From Swiss-Prot:
One of its GO terms (biological process) is negative regulation of neuron apoptotic process. This is Transcription factor AP-2-delta. GO terms for molecular function: DNA-binding transcription factor activity, RNA polymerase II-specific; RNA polymerase II transcription regulatory region sequence-specific DNA binding. Belongs to the AP-2 family. Residues 416-452 are annotated as: Disordered. Sequence-specific DNA-binding protein that interacts with inducible viral and cellular enhancer elements to regulate transcription of selected genes. AP-2 factors bind to the consensus sequence 5'-GCCNNNGGC-3' and activate genes involved in a large spectrum of important biological functions including proper eye, face, body wall, limb and neural tube development. They also suppress a number of genes including MCAM/MUC18, C/EBP alpha and MYC. The keyword Transcription applies. Keywords: Activator, DNA-binding, Nucleus, Phosphoprotein, Transcription, Transcription regulation. PANTHER family: TRANSCRIPTION FACTOR AP-2, TRANSCRIPTION FACTOR AP-2-DELTA. The gene is Tfap2d. It comes from the Eukaryota. It comes from Mus musculus. Residues 280-410 are annotated as: H-S-H (helix-span-helix), dimerization.
Length: 452
């Protein structure tokens, strides 16, 4: 027996303590067989390679008809290339077939170590056939097989990783399929508004969810207010045109500088599906508006508009500008110029009022053409939402100044025309007075002559 299986009984031959040598030989055989089931050939990670003499048909039980592995693979390829031949063209009952193999193995499993070795080899070949049917023979390497056998480190069931690869003869995935597969692998889904979110277990992160609350930079100590920063706003700071790095983003979010501050921030963003690579460089110039969150920038624009409306001396400025051109020949031309300027300014205001740049937790539907909307969105992203409302407030103030200029010119023209009319009427009355006196004197003289 030692000459036939020298590698299986060497442990039993070195024992000389008088124990049952056949029992020790059987234990050594079981240990060798157990080690051989986890060893794979270097040629194929999922193929159990042995010599032809070890798997001769006399070593199998009589109730099982052994089919070599290459015949099984040929039968599998023929069935899949001609699905009309096989009743189960889509391998829906592959699990049922594997259970039948398992029952056949255990029903006819021998007790001696030779048939035990052959039975374990048959189990390995059945597992290879099942993996072929599941479409993972050419898609995974040896370490992937160990992940499928014991469960992956990502907490997924092994069957969830059995995805068909391009080596199985399937059609290449298009751009949409590739994007969908990447989103599925990364756990990223798209909400109804087009925002990028990532699945975390069973919960779904919404871009409108609160990321943190930030104290204002421009508020006084007596009236400090906090502004809510959403996940969508953080994503806008990390995206073009700014592409802020971890240091600048930490400054905006008022995070204290620490040794691992950048790494902690990147890990938190990664859990939310946002990528902030280490060593990133900013893409835009840093201004004072860069340090403001969108809530504070909007608050600043609103206060600026209120101050312009209530405190700017629009009447005094308009009258001062109108008095510079009070000549009679220039007043008509000035009125036409002011009316044309008011019309152009109104058109500009109407355009800015239709801006639908994403801001805060809102992502409105665009109204303008995308050619002009993308430029307005770029300006809004650079100014953190301050730019467009501030310009609208300035244009409204300018409209008020133009209206005051027009009112002053019309009032002055009316006053001049009224004075000229009054002076002309007085001159006519003064010319008619001597005539009345002469006629009255003539009438008196006529009366005296009649009496005489």
């Amino acid at each position: 027996m030692s000459t036939t299986f020298p590698g299986l009984v060497h442990d039993a031959e070195i024992r000389h303590d008088g124990s049952n040598s056949y029992r020790l030989m059987q234990l050594g055989c079981l240990e060798s067989v157990a080690n051989s089931t986890v060893a794979y050939s270097s040629s194929s990670p999922l193929t159990y390679s042995t010599t032809g003499t070890e798997f001769a048909s006399p070593y199998f039980s009589t109730n099982h008809q052994y089919t070599p592995l290459h015949h099984q693979s040929f039968h599998y390829e023929f069935q899949h290339s001609h699905p009309a031949v096989t009743p189960d063209a889509y391998s829906l009952n592959s699990l049922h077939h594997s259970q039948q193999y398992y029952q056949q193995i255990h029903h006819g499993e021998p007790t001696d170590f030779i048939n035990l070795h052959n039975a374990r080899a048959l189990k390995s070949s059945c597992l290879d056939e099942q993996r072929r049917e599941l479409g993972c023979l050419d898609a995974y390497r040896r370490h992937d097989l160990s992940l499928m056998s014991h469960g992956s480190q990502y907490g997924m069931h092994p069957d969830q990783r059995l995805l068909p690869g391009p080596s199985l003869g399937l059609a290449a995935a298009g751009a949409d399929d590739l994007q969908g597969s990447v989103e599925a692998q990364c756990g990223i889904v798209l909400n109804g508004q087009g925002g990028v979110i990532r699945r975390g277990g069973t919960c779904v992160v919404n871009p409108t969810d609160l990321f943190c609350s930030v104290p204002g930079r421009l508020s006084l100590l007596s009236s400090t207010s906090k502004y809510k920063v959403t996940i969508a706003e953080v994503k806008r700071r990390l995206s073009p045109p700014e592409c802020l790095n971890a240091s600048l983003l930490g400054g905006i979010l008022r995070r204290a500088k620490s040794k691992n501050g950048g790494r902690c921030l990147r890990e938190k963003l990664d859990r939310l599906g946002l990528n902030l690579p280490a060593g990133r460089r900013k893409a835009a110039n840093v201004t004072l508006l860069t340090s403001l969150v969108e809530g504070e920038a909007l608050h600043l624009a609103r206060d600026f508009g209120y101050t312009c409306e209530t405190e700017f001396p629009a009447k005094a400025v308009g009258e001062h500008l109108a008095r510079q051109h009070m000549e009679q020949k220039e007043q008509t031309a000035r009125k036409k110029m002011i009316l044309a300027t008011k019309q152009i300014c109104k058109e500009f205001q109407d355009l800015l009022s239709q801006d639908r740049s994403p801001l805060g937790s809102s992502r409105p539907t665009p109204i303008l053409d995308l050619d002009i909307q993308r430029h307005l969105t770029h300006f809004s992203l650079i100014t953190h939402g301050f730019g467009t409302p501030a310009i609208c407030a300035a244009l409204s103030t300018f409209q008020t100044v133009l209206s005051e200029m027009l009112n002053y010119l019309e009032k002055h023209t009316t006053h001049k025309n009224g004075g000229a009319a009054d002076s002309g009427q007085g001159h006519a009355n003064s010319e008619k007075a001597p005539l009345r006196k002469a006629s009255e004197a003539a009438v008196k003289e006529g009366k005296t002559e009649k009496t005489d």
